[in-house]
Amino acid sequence: MSIISMKQLLESGVHFGHQTRRWNPKMASYIFTERNGIYIIDLQKTVRKIEEAYEFVKKIASEGKDILFIGTKKQAQEAIKEEAKRSNMHYVNNRWLGGMLTNFLTIRNRIGKLEELEKMEEDGTFEVLSKKEVIKLRNEKQKLERNLGGIKAMNAENVGALFVVDPRKEKNAISEAKILGIPVVAIVDTNCDPDEVDYVIPGNDDAIRAVKLITSKVADAVIEGRQGEQLAEE
């Protein structure tokens, strides 16, 4: 059974690329045609590439490694969070902070601060502080939660791959992955450079439904891989 159908991709608008004046010539082999000034992505290639990415992610997950889901643009934020949580993986959907992979010790300290503030809120410490102090600490906690909430339980050394929505926007995350030799799977639109990505999924990275569909398939691959890992252990 195929992982995804052309019909699903069409219905979600995965085939709509960017305007023809905003394109990267390196994406030419993934383009089917041009219509009304918009590039149309070749969905036969997208189906094949999703299948390749699915098998790769499944293998990484079956080895007990983690997939870090990244998508900070508005259209990706919800899908990234939902699908990472569904597959019990880590995610960044607000802002990539420099060093999230390459300087995780510093990031870990900030996660420690978030955990400390959560504990203070839970154990009643906030109740004995002044209203002004509580507002300040709550604001700090919210900011930390937005940026770090999805990687609280992450061990950077166990990240086996990145799944990225829009490699142009997430270039800092990709460059950190390159330094560490971590492979990148990404939804790559017609304005992106596919050479920056190990597993290219040609598709629309601006439509919420398109992003959700592809992200859900990556999460499915993680879940299937983890089930395989559990079966192997048994």
Swiss-Prot record:
One of its GO terms (biological process) is translation. This is Small ribosomal subunit protein uS2. GO terms for molecular function: structural constituent of ribosome. Belongs to the universal ribosomal protein uS2 family. One of its GO terms (cellular component) is cytosolic small ribosomal subunit. Signal peptide: none annotated. Keywords: Ribonucleoprotein, Ribosomal protein.
